UniProtKB/Swiss-Prot annotation:
The keyword Transmembrane does not apply. It catalyses: beta-D-fructose 1,6-bisphosphate + H2O = beta-D-fructose 6-phosphate + phosphate. It comes from Oryctolagus cuniculus (Rabbit). Binds 3 Mg(2+) ions per subunit. This is Fructose-1,6-bisphosphatase 1. One of its GO terms (molecular function) is identical protein binding. The modification Phosphotyrosine is found at residues 216, 245, 265. The modification N-acetylalanine is found at residue 2. Its cofactor is Mg(2+). Pfam families: FBPase, FBPase_C. Belongs to the FBPase class 1 family. GO terms for cellular component: cytoplasm; cytosol.
Length: 338
């Protein structure tokens, strides 16, 4: 038997994958430019996250962002990286970031046809204790022929062209959803490229894990309380669901995608509109889930059907395996008619 080569000489990198998909779709190449630029930003953030302690990037930068979270030094760095790389891709016209109060309109000489909404460093409250954090993004096509403005970003999630997230965990993974489904890429630090490791990812029809912050249990809606009780104490004496909650949306949603189950950040008495942001947290994750065969809902409607009125709008979110989300919806509807 012939010896195997020391490494694969025909690897499918993310750059190659995106170029092939663009060619199949007869595209202009702008999406390829955009995603390649985003990839560069993710690689740079990954490096910064891993050497944060040495580079004194831990700690607070001394301000709060528009949604009231304390801004960490890494947040500022990550936001600048993503913002600068997207502007220089010549593929974007409007950029919405969790860290900026207003939408950023790209300079006329650098404009392209895409609108990008992103959270540069999700879960950053976990930075100091080395818990996995990530970057989330959603890409829309500009619909109007008018001068670019904030209203170009106020599109429902159904209009997303592509969405994804990067997870900075034991390895750096980039999950991308688009016309060809959901695909996962792992960063190979030896060659500095994202390598395709999972093609056409699908979520399990039903899982056995639930994920939510039970610290807010006293403020839960009755429907949420009943659903969680049912998972802990199944009426048919079947095995109870396991509970897993990191507190970093990217980490919790990624685990849900890989193992199946349900992730919940529902509305409660203190946060009647939910806590997670629609444009750059809920919509991209809902898009990925639906492309992987899962579901994503507020309880009242599909996440992707919400027409936003504000770039920092919040929404409740329940997403995951279709059977699990459907079971939650049945309980939710039962309580809604009471």
């Amino acid at each position: 038997m012939a010896d195997k080569a020391p490494f694969d000489t025909d690897i499918s990198t993310m750059t190659r994958f995106v170029m092939e998909e663009g060619r199949k779709a007869g595209g202009t190449g702008e999406m390829t430019q955009l995603l390649n630029s985003l990839c560069t930003a993710v690689k740079a953030i990954s490096t910064a996250v891993r050497k944060a302690g040495i580079a004194h990037l831990y700690g607070i930068a001394g301000s709060t962002n528009v949604t009231g979270d304390q801004v960490k030094k890494l947040d500022v760095l990550s936001n600048d990286l993503v913002m600068n790389m997207l502007k220089s891709s010549f593929a974007t016209c409007v950029l919405v970031s969790e860290e900026d109060k207003n939408a950023i309109i790209v300079e006329p000489e650098k404009r392209g046809k895409y609108v990008v909404c992103f959270d540069p460093l999700d879960g950053s409250s976990n930075i100091d204790c080395l818990v996995s954090i990530g970057t989330i993004f959603g890409i829309y096509r500009k619909k109007s022929t008018d001068e670019p403005s904030t209203k170009d970003a106020l599109q429902p999630g159904r209009n997303l062209v592509a969405a994804g997230y990067a997870l900075y965990g034991s390895a750096t993974m980039l999950v991308l959803a688009g016309g060809s489904g959901v695909n996962s890429f792992m960063l190979d630090p030896a060659i500095g490229e994202f390598i395709l490791v999972d093609k056409n990812v699908k979520i399990k029809k039903k899982g056995n894990i639930y994920s939510l912050n039970e610290g807010y249990a006293k403020d839960f809606d009755p429907a949420v309380t009943e659903y969680i009780q049912k998972k802990k104490f199944p009426p048919d004496n079947s095995s109870p669901y396991g509970a897993r909650y990191v507190g970093s949306m990217v980490a919790d949603v990624h685990r849900t995608l890989v193992y199946g189950g349900i992730f919940l950040y529902p509305a409660n008495k203190k946060s009647p509109d939910g806590k997670l942001r629609l444009l750059y947290e809920c919509n991209p994750m809902a898009f990925i889930m639906e492309k992987a065969g899962g579901m994503a809902t507020t309880g009242k409607e599909a996440i992707l059907d919400i027409v936003p009125t504000d770039i920092h709008q919040r929404a409740p979110v329940i997403l995951g395996s279709p059977d699990d989300v459907q079971e939650f919806l049945e309980i939710y509807k039962k309580h809604a008619v009471k």
